[in-house]
Regions:
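Non-heme Fe(II) oxygenase catalytic core, chiefly the N-lobe of the double-stranded beta-helix
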Residues: 105-143, 147-154
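Residue-level "contact hotspot" at macromolecular interaction interfaces
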Residues: 63, 117-119, 230, 252
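Structural signature of FAD isoalloxazine-binding scaffolds in flavoprotein oxidoreductases
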Residues: 88-105, 120, 255-265
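Catalytic-pocket segment enriched in acidic/His residues
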Residues: 10, 53, 80, 154-294
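N-terminal non-catalytic cap/leader segment that marks the start of a structured domain
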Residues: 1-92, 258-260, 279-282, 286-294
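Short beta-strand segments
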Residues: 7, 72-73, 96-97, 119-129, ...
Protein backbone atom coordinates (compact mmCIF):
# COMPACT_ATOMS: atom_id res chain seq x y z
CA UNK A 1 0.00 0.00 0.00
CA UNK A 2 0.90 3.68 -0.27
CA UNK A 3 0.47 5.98 2.70
CA UNK A 4 0.49 9.77 2.63
CA UNK A 5 0.30 12.53 5.18
CA UNK A 6 -1.88 15.28 3.76
CA UNK A 7 -3.60 18.55 4.56
CA UNK A 8 -7.15 19.12 3.33
CA UNK A 9 -10.03 21.36 4.41
CA UNK A 10 -8.02 22.71 7.33
CA UNK A 11 -7.09 19.28 8.73
CA UNK A 12 -3.92 17.20 8.67
CA UNK A 13 -4.18 13.41 8.57
CA UNK A 14 -2.74 10.16 7.25
CA UNK A 15 -4.39 8.62 4.21
CA UNK A 16 -4.31 5.51 2.05
CA UNK A 17 -3.69 6.14 -1.66
CA UNK A 18 -6.02 4.42 -4.09
CA UNK A 19 -4.41 2.26 -6.80
CA UNK A 20 -5.08 5.00 -9.37
CA UNK A 21 -2.89 7.41 -7.32
CA UNK A 22 -5.55 10.08 -7.86
CA UNK A 23 -7.74 9.45 -4.83
CA UNK A 24 -7.24 8.66 -1.17
CA UNK A 25 -9.10 7.54 1.94
CA UNK A 26 -8.58 9.10 5.34
CA UNK A 27 -7.08 6.85 8.04
CA UNK A 28 -8.98 7.26 11.30
CA UNK A 29 -6.91 5.06 13.60
CA UNK A 30 -3.91 6.71 15.35
CA UNK A 31 -0.50 6.15 13.78
CA UNK A 32 0.65 4.40 16.97
CA UNK A 33 -2.08 1.78 16.42
CA UNK A 34 -1.90 1.06 12.71
CA UNK A 35 1.80 1.53 11.90
CA UNK A 36 3.08 -1.46 13.94
CA UNK A 37 0.14 -3.63 12.86
CA UNK A 38 -0.05 -2.93 9.14
CA UNK A 39 2.44 -5.58 8.05
CA UNK A 40 0.43 -8.37 9.68
CA UNK A 41 -3.14 -7.05 9.76
CA UNK A 42 -3.21 -5.26 6.43
CA UNK A 43 -5.64 -2.45 5.64
CA UNK A 44 -8.15 -3.69 8.22
CA UNK A 45 -6.17 -1.92 10.96
CA UNK A 46 -6.42 1.52 9.34
CA UNK A 47 -10.02 2.43 10.13
CA UNK A 48 -10.60 3.88 6.67
CA UNK A 49 -13.29 6.40 5.80
CA UNK A 50 -15.74 5.21 3.19
CA UNK A 51 -15.39 8.50 1.33
CA UNK A 52 -12.68 8.95 -1.30
CA UNK A 53 -11.01 12.36 -1.62
CA UNK A 54 -9.32 13.67 -4.74
CA UNK A 55 -5.56 13.85 -4.29
CA UNK A 56 -5.61 17.09 -6.27
CA UNK A 57 -7.66 18.66 -3.45
CA UNK A 58 -5.01 17.78 -0.85
CA UNK A 59 -1.53 19.08 -0.10
CA UNK A 60 1.11 16.40 0.32
CA UNK A 61 3.10 16.92 3.52
CA UNK A 62 6.36 15.30 4.61
CA UNK A 63 5.38 11.76 5.72
CA UNK A 64 6.52 12.39 9.30
CA UNK A 65 4.38 11.55 12.33
CA UNK A 66 4.45 14.37 14.92
CA UNK A 67 7.11 13.58 17.52
CA UNK A 68 9.13 11.36 15.19
CA UNK A 69 12.70 12.24 14.21
CA UNK A 70 14.59 12.46 10.93
CA UNK A 71 18.08 10.96 10.78
CA UNK A 72 20.59 11.47 8.00
CA UNK A 73 23.50 9.32 6.88
CA UNK A 74 26.37 10.50 4.72
CA UNK A 75 29.17 8.90 2.69
CA UNK A 76 27.24 5.68 2.02
CA UNK A 77 27.85 5.12 -1.72
CA UNK A 78 31.29 4.06 -2.90
CA UNK A 79 30.97 5.76 -6.31
CA UNK A 80 30.35 9.10 -4.59
CA UNK A 81 33.42 8.64 -2.38
CA UNK A 82 35.59 7.65 -5.34
CA UNK A 83 34.76 10.88 -7.15
CA UNK A 84 35.64 12.84 -4.02
CA UNK A 85 38.90 10.92 -3.59
CA UNK A 86 37.82 9.58 -0.19
CA UNK A 87 38.02 6.13 1.36
CA UNK A 88 34.94 4.34 2.69
CA UNK A 89 34.32 5.08 6.39
CA UNK A 90 34.59 2.38 9.03
CA UNK A 91 31.09 3.16 10.29
CA UNK A 92 28.18 5.35 9.16
CA UNK A 93 28.38 9.13 9.48
CA UNK A 94 25.00 10.02 10.98
CA UNK A 95 23.26 13.21 12.06
CA UNK A 96 19.83 14.50 13.11
CA UNK A 97 17.57 16.80 11.13
CA UNK A 98 14.94 18.99 12.82
CA UNK A 99 11.41 18.65 11.48
CA UNK A 100 11.63 22.33 10.48
CA UNK A 101 14.09 21.29 7.76
CA UNK A 102 11.52 19.08 6.00
CA UNK A 103 9.20 20.05 3.15
CA UNK A 104 6.78 17.96 1.12
CA UNK A 105 6.31 17.22 -2.56
CA UNK A 106 5.87 20.36 -4.67
CA UNK A 107 6.81 22.62 -1.74
CA UNK A 108 9.40 25.33 -2.35
CA UNK A 109 12.93 24.65 -1.13
CA UNK A 110 14.35 27.59 0.79
CA UNK A 111 17.68 28.99 -0.44
CA UNK A 112 19.42 29.86 2.86
CA UNK A 113 21.41 33.05 3.27
CA UNK A 114 24.26 31.05 4.80
CA UNK A 115 25.40 29.34 1.60
CA UNK A 116 26.41 29.95 -2.01
CA UNK A 117 26.81 26.24 -2.79
CA UNK A 118 23.40 24.61 -2.45
CA UNK A 119 23.55 20.97 -3.50
CA UNK A 120 21.13 18.06 -4.11
CA UNK A 121 21.17 14.39 -3.03
CA UNK A 122 18.55 11.83 -4.02
CA UNK A 123 18.15 9.29 -1.21
CA UNK A 124 16.12 6.24 -0.25
CA UNK A 125 14.40 7.00 3.08
CA UNK A 126 13.26 4.25 5.47
CA UNK A 127 10.27 4.90 7.76
CA UNK A 128 10.05 2.95 11.02
CA UNK A 129 6.88 1.06 11.95
CA UNK A 130 7.96 -0.01 15.42
CA UNK A 131 10.96 -0.07 17.74
CA UNK A 132 13.74 -2.50 16.92
CA UNK A 133 13.42 -5.74 18.87
CA UNK A 134 15.27 -9.04 18.64
CA UNK A 135 14.55 -9.61 14.97
CA UNK A 136 17.53 -10.94 12.99
CA UNK A 137 16.92 -8.22 10.37
CA UNK A 138 16.30 -4.67 11.55
CA UNK A 139 14.62 -3.83 8.24
CA UNK A 140 11.67 -6.00 9.29
CA UNK A 141 10.71 -3.07 11.57
CA UNK A 142 10.36 -0.72 8.58
CA UNK A 143 6.88 0.53 7.69
CA UNK A 144 7.97 1.46 4.19
CA UNK A 145 10.17 3.65 2.04
CA UNK A 146 9.94 7.09 0.51
CA UNK A 147 12.06 9.49 -1.54
CA UNK A 148 14.32 12.12 0.02
CA UNK A 149 16.39 14.99 -1.37
CA UNK A 150 19.00 15.87 1.23
CA UNK A 151 19.71 19.44 0.09
CA UNK A 152 23.10 20.47 1.49
CA UNK A 153 25.03 23.71 1.99
CA UNK A 154 28.44 22.52 0.79
CA UNK A 155 30.39 25.60 1.86
CA UNK A 156 29.16 25.39 5.45
CA UNK A 157 32.01 25.53 7.94
CA UNK A 158 34.60 26.66 5.41
CA UNK A 159 35.14 29.95 7.22
CA UNK A 160 35.99 28.14 10.44
CA UNK A 161 37.75 25.23 8.68
CA UNK A 162 35.60 22.67 10.49
CA UNK A 163 32.72 20.35 9.63
CA UNK A 164 29.42 22.13 10.34
CA UNK A 165 26.56 19.66 9.90
CA UNK A 166 24.04 22.02 11.53
CA UNK A 167 24.48 24.56 8.74
CA UNK A 168 25.09 22.00 6.03
CA UNK A 169 22.13 19.70 6.66
CA UNK A 170 19.58 21.24 9.05
CA UNK A 171 18.52 24.67 7.79
CA UNK A 172 14.84 25.59 7.54
CA UNK A 173 12.80 24.09 4.69
CA UNK A 174 15.72 22.57 2.82
CA UNK A 175 14.91 18.83 2.83
CA UNK A 176 12.12 17.53 0.59
CA UNK A 177 10.72 14.11 1.44
CA UNK A 178 7.76 12.23 -0.05
CA UNK A 179 5.51 12.07 -1.92
CA UNK A 180 4.29 9.09 0.13
CA UNK A 181 5.40 5.91 1.88
CA UNK A 182 5.37 2.62 -0.04
CA UNK A 183 5.30 -0.57 2.03
CA UNK A 184 7.70 -3.49 1.43
CA UNK A 185 4.70 -5.65 0.51
CA UNK A 186 3.75 -3.20 -2.24
CA UNK A 187 7.34 -3.31 -3.50
CA UNK A 188 7.35 -7.11 -3.31
CA UNK A 189 10.47 -7.27 -1.14
CA UNK A 190 11.60 -8.49 2.24
CA UNK A 191 14.42 -6.49 3.74
CA UNK A 192 16.18 -3.81 1.76
CA UNK A 193 14.73 -3.00 -1.67
CA UNK A 194 17.04 -2.69 -4.68
CA UNK A 195 15.61 0.28 -6.54
CA UNK A 196 16.90 2.44 -9.37
CA UNK A 197 17.12 6.11 -8.43
CA UNK A 198 17.86 9.28 -10.35
CA UNK A 199 17.79 13.03 -9.95
CA UNK A 200 17.28 15.76 -12.55
CA UNK A 201 17.85 19.51 -12.38
CA UNK A 202 15.80 21.47 -14.91
CA UNK A 203 15.26 18.21 -16.80
CA UNK A 204 18.99 17.37 -16.97
CA UNK A 205 20.04 14.03 -15.46
CA UNK A 206 22.57 14.52 -12.66
CA UNK A 207 22.41 11.36 -10.51
CA UNK A 208 21.63 7.73 -11.36
CA UNK A 209 22.29 4.55 -9.35
CA UNK A 210 20.62 1.68 -7.49
CA UNK A 211 20.08 1.38 -3.74
CA UNK A 212 21.88 -1.99 -3.76
CA UNK A 213 25.14 -0.02 -4.04
CA UNK A 214 25.01 1.28 -0.45
CA UNK A 215 28.13 0.64 1.62
CA UNK A 216 26.08 0.16 4.79
CA UNK A 217 22.69 -1.45 4.03
CA UNK A 218 19.48 -0.50 5.81
CA UNK A 219 19.85 -3.26 8.44
CA UNK A 220 23.25 -1.95 9.50
CA UNK A 221 22.19 1.70 9.45
CA UNK A 222 19.22 1.00 11.71
CA UNK A 223 21.35 -1.04 14.12
CA UNK A 224 23.98 1.71 14.23
CA UNK A 225 21.44 4.43 14.99
CA UNK A 226 19.41 2.39 17.47
CA UNK A 227 22.52 1.58 19.51
CA UNK A 228 22.89 5.33 20.13
CA UNK A 229 19.36 6.74 19.99
CA UNK A 230 16.46 4.30 20.34
CA UNK A 231 14.43 4.41 17.16
CA UNK A 232 10.69 5.06 17.39
CA UNK A 233 7.70 4.41 15.16
CA UNK A 234 7.56 7.07 12.45
CA UNK A 235 11.26 7.94 12.50
CA UNK A 236 12.74 8.69 9.07
CA UNK A 237 16.21 7.44 8.14
CA UNK A 238 17.84 8.99 5.06
CA UNK A 239 20.29 6.37 3.78
CA UNK A 240 22.84 8.43 1.85
CA UNK A 241 23.31 9.55 -1.74
CA UNK A 242 25.28 8.46 -4.75
CA UNK A 243 27.63 10.21 -7.20
CA UNK A 244 26.66 13.09 -9.47
CA UNK A 245 26.18 15.80 -6.85
CA UNK A 246 27.25 19.39 -7.42
CA UNK A 247 30.13 19.02 -4.97
CA UNK A 248 31.87 16.83 -7.54
CA UNK A 249 31.75 19.21 -10.51
CA UNK A 250 30.67 22.61 -9.17
CA UNK A 251 27.15 22.57 -10.66
CA UNK A 252 25.23 23.88 -7.66
CA UNK A 253 21.56 24.82 -7.42
CA UNK A 254 20.29 28.32 -8.12
CA UNK A 255 17.02 30.11 -7.28
CA UNK A 256 14.32 29.03 -9.71
CA UNK A 257 15.84 25.61 -10.48
CA UNK A 258 13.43 22.67 -10.64
CA UNK A 259 14.74 19.52 -8.93
CA UNK A 260 13.15 16.09 -9.40
CA UNK A 261 14.28 13.13 -7.32
CA UNK A 262 12.85 9.79 -8.48
CA UNK A 263 13.07 6.24 -7.14
CA UNK A 264 11.43 3.43 -9.11
CA UNK A 265 8.44 2.00 -7.29
CA UNK A 266 8.25 4.95 -4.89
CA UNK A 267 7.55 7.96 -7.09
CA UNK A 268 8.89 11.37 -8.00
CA UNK A 269 9.61 14.19 -5.57
CA UNK A 270 9.59 17.51 -7.42
CA UNK A 271 10.47 20.89 -5.89
CA UNK A 272 11.59 24.34 -7.00
CA UNK A 273 14.36 26.38 -5.37
CA UNK A 274 13.03 29.59 -3.85
CA UNK A 275 14.67 33.03 -3.78
CA UNK A 276 17.82 33.48 -1.75
CA UNK A 277 17.00 34.47 1.79
CA UNK A 278 18.33 37.86 2.95
CA UNK A 279 19.13 38.35 6.63
CA UNK A 280 18.97 41.61 8.53
CA UNK A 281 22.40 43.18 9.19
CA UNK A 282 21.49 43.26 12.88
CA UNK A 283 23.20 40.61 15.04
CA UNK A 284 25.68 39.85 12.29
CA UNK A 285 28.55 39.03 14.62
CA UNK A 286 28.80 35.31 15.18
CA UNK A 287 26.53 34.44 12.27
CA UNK A 288 29.33 33.01 10.14
CA UNK A 289 31.73 32.09 12.91
CA UNK A 290 35.17 33.61 13.35
CA UNK A 291 38.08 33.13 10.97
CA UNK A 292 41.16 31.32 12.25
CA UNK A 293 43.34 33.61 14.34
CA UNK A 294 40.60 36.07 15.28
Amino acid sequence: VRLARVAAAGEVFWALLAPDLRHLQRIREPFSVWAPALGQAGKACLGLDDEFLALSACRLLPPLEPGARAFGVGLNYRSHLERLGSAAPAHPLAYLKPDSALVGADDEIAYPAMTEQLDYEVELVAVLARPLGDEPRAASCVLGYTVGNDISARDAGRRIARLDLLTQKAMDRTTPVGPWIVTPEELGVEGQPELDMRLKVNGQLRQQDNSREMIFPVDELLNYLDARISLRPGDLVFTGSTHGVGLEDGRFLMPGDRVEAHIDGLGTLGNRIGPRRVLSPARERGRLGRPAGE
